Each structure stands twice: as C-alpha cells, then as structure tokens.
Amino acid sequence: VCKKTDQVEHMVDNFAYLINKLGFIPNGNRTYYLGRSQPPFFALMVNLLSEEKRVAILLKYKAALEKEYHFWMYGTEELNYRKPAIDRVVRLADNIVMNRYWDAKADPRPEAYAEDKHIAAASANAPEIVYRHIRAAAESGWDFSSRWFKDGKEMASIQTTDLIPVDLNCLLLY
C-alpha cells in the first residue's frame, strides 16, 4: 500500500459509502452515470488494505462487499431458458451463471451524445441496442477497445452486452 494506508482507507471509505447508498460504485459522480458501474475492483481494494489493517478491515467493509456483489448478481433467480439474460447476469446452456457489462439505459451517453448518435447511424443494429453496447463498454473501463467490436475495427460493430468477459468474471470470483 506504499505507506499511504490512511489515504487508501479513505478512498475505500468513499467507495463503500457509494455502494451503501446506491448499491454500486457509479462510473462517475454525476447523475447520468447512475446506469453504469465501475468494474468490480472493490474487493481487491479491500483485500489490499487488509494486508496492513488485517481482518478487522474485512469486517468493516463486509456489508459493502456483499451489496456490490448482489448488484452484479441481480436477476440470477429469475433466469431461465426463456429469459437467459437479465441485466448483468447470463445463464449459459449448462446452467452456469456468468456476468457481462450492462447499462440500464439505452440512449446516447450525455457525455458523448453526438458521437454516440453518429456511431448508431453507421451501425446495422437498432440505435437503442448500439447505445446500450456503448454504455456497457464504458462500464467495463475498456472504452473503446476493439475487444468489443464484432469486426475488430469499427465501433459501429460494437457488441459489448453480447460478450461474457473473462476478466469481469474473475473479478467477481475474487
């Protein structure tokens, strides 16, 4: 923690506050970010802090850790063969539940409205599908890597919510 344990703990306190208040850490501190989260690194931050502060710190953040996990797993109980995906959870054919990036909104991002409209106009998909894929990519922190593009080149081929990212699922298993 580089001798900055107090600073790290204050940052984790701020993230815990957001989780306890909203259920997740928003992509930013503006109301238009309330549809998407930050990637789930909170457990890793708490674990890093526990190297200095020991088990007591794990107990301090237990409720926030559980709440963030429940945010990412919301909808799991309602998944079935007719509805294999709800928000950030997807049930695969073998009944395993995995996670994906998602955004509750399906309209252009306020912070990049004109750009999103332009990308949607160039896409073969319906605009609301493109907007959700763009927003989900922003939630991932990989905005806008070619990993989300079907053709590997053009943002108009974005397909973020159709993919199950291994890194996201590893973070949630931590």
Language model segments and positions:
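Acidic, mature catalytic/reactive cores of soluble proteins
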Residues: 1-174
